[in-house]
Amino acid sequence: MSSQTLAAKADFAFVRLKPEVAGVAVGEAALDDVFVDDIIVPAADRYPLGATLFLPRTGRRSHAVLINSGTAVPRKLYRGFAGYLAHRGCAVLTYDYRGTGDSRLKAVTGYNQPRSLVGFKASMADWAAKDVTSAVQWMRERYGNMPLTYVGHSFGGQVLGLLPNNKEVSRALFIAAQAGYWKLMASPERYRVYAMLNFVGAPLTKTFGYMPGWAGLGMDLPKDAFLQWVSWVMKERYLFSDSTLHTRENFHNFKGPLRAICLTDDPWATRPAVELLCSGFTATKPEIVSISPDDAGVKKIGHMGFFRPEHRDTLWRGAAEWLQAEQ
């Protein structure tokens, strides 16, 4: 292991320290020193995206941070981490992709119930071209006097390479972001995923007209988004193998520093899967940092656990220091 990698790992793995302030979010607890506002961010086609803006109540704002969700992950998962970054002086935006979370249109009648996704048109390529691209633009227009940094969790990291405006991003931090080819997943999880997607998810999606969350993902997904994801998971080079995805060329345009965090107990974003995704960013030299639960002083992290508030004095602090390194 190189001295550079050791140094990077040390940024994220150190003994637990006394919390910096009691007001930092714990779960859904209030952030005493952070202004939190639920807003609407218009996508490229004016579709309303449910979003939350986190701002420090006092002090100078030093950086803008855009947090991009994993597939079928509501933005509220990132609330604690977003609040922590805002406490440190960042303007932070979280949001839901169209057809998910608070970016799902409401039914015309019926106690604020979400509208059916049957017939709703949205693919993962649409999320990239219309939603994420617009979120980057929205942050750049409002915070143009400060570095715009990018946090991508799982799909949220993958999509950076598809953005036509990824040059606007100063630096990017990937958390459990990978090329999701099923054979690169750890065993036996790879077989469970293969069976679930092909023998449960795809048939249900074609039958119902959308992927019902109760079938295993926890959140309903638009039909086209789910089926496009399944097609990528079955390809050896994941989205890089999709000849219809012309925005793959945008991977070569991102030139900022890129650090990819690989959690060693994550069965989805294994080291080979993270390396495959990072290989697409040819105009920069991605730095891959492997972190084990022992490094963070916990028993388990996995694919989703980085964003648990228990990591605010270890993993979160290292992430924040790296994101804010550029002045």
Would you name each region that the model predicts?
Residues 6-56:
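N-terminal cap/lid segment of alpha/beta-hydrolase-fold proteins
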Residues 116-142:
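Alpha/beta-hydrolase active-site loop
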